[in-house]
Amino acid sequence: MYHIFQISSEVFRAFGLKMKILLTLVFSGLLIWSVVLVSFSNDFNNQLLVATSNVSRESETPRDRLIGGLLTADFDEGSCLSRYQQSLLYRKASPYKPSEYLVSKLRSYEKLHKRCGPGTDAYKKATEILGHDDENYASKSVGECRYIVWVAVYGLGNRILTLASVFLYALLTERVVLVDQSKDISDLFCEPFPGTSWLLPLEFPLMKQIDGYNKGYSRCYGTMLNNQAINSTLIPPHLYLHILHDSRDNDKMFFCQKDQSLVDKVPWLIVKANVYFVPSLWLNPTFQTELMKLFPQKEAVFHHLARYLFHPTNQVWGLITRSYNAYLSRADETLGIQIRVFSDRAGYFQHVMDQVVACTRRENLLPEPAAQEEPKVNISRSQKLKAVLVTSLYPEYSETLKNMYWERPSSTGEIIEVYQPSGERVQQTDKKLHDQKALAEMYLLSLTDKIVTSARSTFGYVAHSLGGLKPWLLYQPTGPTAPDPPCIQSTSMDPCHLTPPSHGCEPEWGTNSGKVVPFVRHCEDRGNDGLKLFDEL
């Protein structure tokens, strides 16, 4: 019996040793597998976070997530992915660097907004004065908190351009900018200022009235000037600024130096605008001195302001990154083409298509289709791929271009891929998904290497200026034939102020506002109308 137990004991010891080895192997395997899983999970999360894993880059230099100091690092990245990721999608770093003075001014503004923004005692006190509309504020101190309210009107391109303009004015005059949230602004953009909100509270005392403000409103600045109802001894608690395409000469006096000394004393400004009015601010000598320090590269004003202010929400950023990765990231070269038809009977027009083709071929942006098929079929994988992103309400333009390079090869041997994200035929401003798609397409256009845009199009202005691109501008057709020449390349990327003051601020009303200062001149796509900032003299 003893021998049996002795044998059993040895068997168990041997079995126990094998079990230890087996368990060690199992646990080692599990440990290695868990490390692999964690690594895979982290990698997956990182890819999900950036959503740009296959973005092609020309260099391996680290991306500048704060864009030269434009952005502060005080935000949680996950709440707004685009804020710190936008620089990753651009193939080249922007040659336009923000000045140290601009960066310093933005940090100071953020502190001001935090002290005076919604929810603060200062904001509560400032709104109380709006209940006393008959009072004169000429001799009263309103403290450091003065405000300018941006009201959303017209299409998305107009809104982005005007909001940037209003913010710059706030920066110059040390006002706090508040944004009308009755439309879909919060579905499109993240909050731009840390620790506070730029959204105008819905209980704002004038909220129910501001939609009805127009040139006839008694507190409209142009109307008050006309009626001689405002001067240094008669200052109302709020003013309405009408900076629209139908502004009168008196409305446009707002840009003048002596008028600003009056406007500066008003605690609240309410603005409706549908034009990019930044160039006209440079006509004011006081503003001009400050603007020169803020923007040594004058044509980069909107470029910097847009990259600071406008960060698409995560939902919109998903539209952008998925489209970019699927259609643009693998291309050797990308071209954006934005087509806007200004016509009572909009749609697909052959002369517009002819104009686009003529422009892209003449400027060597796209190759001509080959006259005939090559005798040998090129199946090389090293052929150059050029991706063409087309944005238009009408899909027929991209379909025509796509068929052109499907039916015949390109004369250069390049592979031409044409892609249009959407073609909704009708502009549907204030419909959430429509506006989100429109914003995504503006950003996608800004990511291309070269860009062709339609004259007068605010959609196009936003896209090329955001991307730091000097566009080829398609002249607006004046009849049923394509213009000749079809387009012109701009020497400045800044947008155009489409209906600016026609005169300077001096008494001689005949002054040409395009000749007041050498770097504010008429836009290439507007003849003797419109003002634009140029660096090239």
Curated annotation (Swiss-Prot):
Gene Ontology biological-process annotations: cell wall biogenesis; cell wall organization; protein glycosylation
Q: Which residues form the signal peptide?
A: none
Keyword list, A-Z: Cell wall biogenesis/degradation, Glycoprotein, Glycosyltransferase, Golgi apparatus, Membrane, Signal-anchor, Transferase, Transmembrane, Transmembrane helix
In which compartments does the protein localize?
Golgi apparatus, Golgi stack membrane
Write the Enzyme Commission number(s) for this entry. Answer: 2.4.1.-
Regions of this protein lying in the Lumenal compartment = 42-537
Residue ranges in the Cytoplasmic topological domain are 1-20
Expression (tissue specificity): Expressed in roots and flowers.
**Similarity section:** Belongs to the glycosyltransferase 37 family.
Query: What's the protein name?
Result: Fucosyltransferase 6
Please report the organism this UniProt entry assigns to the protein: Arabidopsis thaliana (Mouse-ear cress)
